[in-house]
């Protein structure tokens, strides 16, 4: 893998669906499970990752949430997925329906042109 590619930031859109086991927990039990079973593993096994979590169950029947992860590079993202797979998050509390992974403005970076597809109004 070329050095530039290895250190390119990665964004992952993790499309997930809650499981009946997760929904059977009270809100307090969910917060406790997440903060004691998932967060410590991610913090211990990763560096250079950030996340945002979006509720989508009122807009989609296919997925209930979208977890957006930004990683400093491919290796940081790989460590994140490996860490999550070792927790009840993966397949017990949530079904990972799809992973959409990319690099922001990769085309512009590859060809050395302005990122004309990134807009702000």
UniProtKB/Swiss-Prot annotation:
InterPro entries per the UniProt record, alphabetical: Darcynin
Pfam families, per database record: Darcynin
Family per record: Belongs to the darcynin family.
Protein's name according to its UniProt entry: Darcynin homolog
Species name: Streptomyces coelicolor (strain ATCC BAA-471 / A3(2) / M145)
Organism ancestry: Bacteria, Bacillati, Actinomycetota, Actinomycetes, Kitasatosporales
């Amino acid at each position: 893998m070329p050095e530039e590619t290895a250190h390119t930031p990665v964004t992952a859109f993790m499309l997930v669906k809650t499981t009946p086991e997760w929904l059977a927990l009270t809100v307090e039990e969910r917060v406790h499970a997440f903060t004691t079973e998932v967060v410590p593993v991610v913090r211990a096994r990763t560096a250079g990752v950030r996340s945002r979590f979006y509720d989508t169950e009122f807009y989609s029947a296919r997925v209930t949430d979208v977890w957006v992860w930004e990683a400093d590079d491919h290796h940081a993202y790989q460590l994140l997925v490996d860490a999550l797979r070792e927790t009840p998050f993966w397949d017990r509390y949530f079904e990972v329906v799809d992973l959409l992974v990319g690099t922001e403005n990769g085309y512009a970076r590859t060809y050395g042109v302005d990122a004309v597809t990134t807009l702000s109004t």
